[in-house]
């Protein structure tokens, strides 16, 4: 079985670390935990010597975390309660991890996604389907869909036990059905402290590609988040595939930055683009 990185709650904050991605990821920090987090980051790096540390922090903590060996890879304006920016700050402890070999290709993908370079588009065929919030009864079918779409993934979303746990912990999944068959899925992970939501895990059955189902499901997920008064939506997606970047750009998300060699996918480290959208 694949060994995924560990997610550790520290006070009101959250860190992920491990050798699957060979990194430490400060996913969420609460101001009350700054001293604890500083010590934990130091201890982890001293123990494991990870190649990269990435930290998502509010602008007010920039002076603490933006040291001379740290670079800002992305920024989401008004991430915290629609007021304070979130910074994605990275330290590359292994210089080779900072080598951006795909830079030109990624920039071209961004420009195409934003409509600055024209490409031919397939016509979207009308389709009748149902979108709804997933329940525990859907877990097996969602995992089956993810196994068919993703060869590897940063989190074990193809495993029913894991999916059940994160649903119990509050992550919401949404599905699209055609003839009572789940053919698309996606997740919303709300950060109540920030009033922000990560839109993630979007997948469509290969047999139903080209019908605009991802766009429809993303729009539905956004509407559900607006009803909860969430202020900002964002995604961290693979930087090189055109479809997922064009999906978010087409849904009026703004490009925020690129996390270089951030995530292990199919045995290599890939860069990830960040897109965000103000919902309220």
What is each PLM-predicted segment?
Residues 1-48, 62-63, 83:
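N-terminal charged segments
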Residues 6-23, 141-206:
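A conserved beta-strand-loop-helix scaffold within acyl/acetyltransferase catalytic domains
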Residues 20-27, 103-108, 112-156, 274:
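Short amphipathic alpha-helix that is part of the acyltransferase structural core
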Residues 45-57, 225-237:
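Conserved GNAT acetyl-CoA-binding A-motif
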Residues 64-67, 89, 247-248:
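Conserved active-site tyrosine of GNAT-family acetyltransferases
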Residues 80-105, 116, 261-280:
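C-terminal "cap" of GNAT-fold acetyltransferases
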């Amino acid at each position: 079985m694949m060994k995924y990185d560990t997610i550790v709650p520290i006070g009101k904050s959250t860190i992920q670390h491990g050798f699957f991605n060979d990194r430490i990821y400060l996913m969420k920090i609460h101001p009350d935990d700054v001293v604890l987090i500083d010590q934990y980051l130091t201890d982890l790096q001293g123990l494991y010597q990870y190649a990269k540390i990435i930290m998502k922090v509010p602008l007010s903590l920039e002076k603490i975390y933006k040291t001379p060996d740290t670079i800002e890879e992305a920024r989401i304006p008004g991430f915290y309660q629609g007021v304070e920016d979130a910074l994605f700050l990275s330290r590359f402890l292994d210089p080779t991890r900072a080598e951006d070999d795909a830079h030109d290709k990624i920039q071209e993908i961004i420009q195409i996604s934003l409509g600055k370079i024209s490409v031919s588009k397939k016509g979207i065929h009308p389709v009748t389907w149902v979108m709804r919030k997933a329940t525990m009864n859907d877990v097996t079918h969602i995992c089956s869909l993810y196994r068919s779409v993703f060869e590897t993934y940063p989190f074990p979303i193809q495993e029913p036990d894991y999916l059940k746990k994160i649903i119990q912990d509050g992550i919401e999944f949404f599905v699209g059905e055609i003839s009572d068959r789940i053919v698309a899925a996606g997740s919303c992970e709300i950060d109540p402290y920030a009033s922000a939501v990560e839109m993630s895990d979007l997948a469509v059955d290969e047999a139903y590609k080209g019908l605009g189902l991802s766009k429809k499901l993303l729009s539905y997920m956004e509407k559900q988040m607006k009803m909860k008064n969430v202020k900002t939506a964002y995604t961290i997606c693979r930087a090189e595939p055109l479809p997922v970047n064009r999906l978010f750009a087409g849904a009026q998300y703004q490009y925020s930055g690129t996390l270089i060699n951030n995530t292990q996918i199919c045995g290599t480290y890939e860069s990830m683009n960040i897109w965000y959208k103000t919902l309220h």
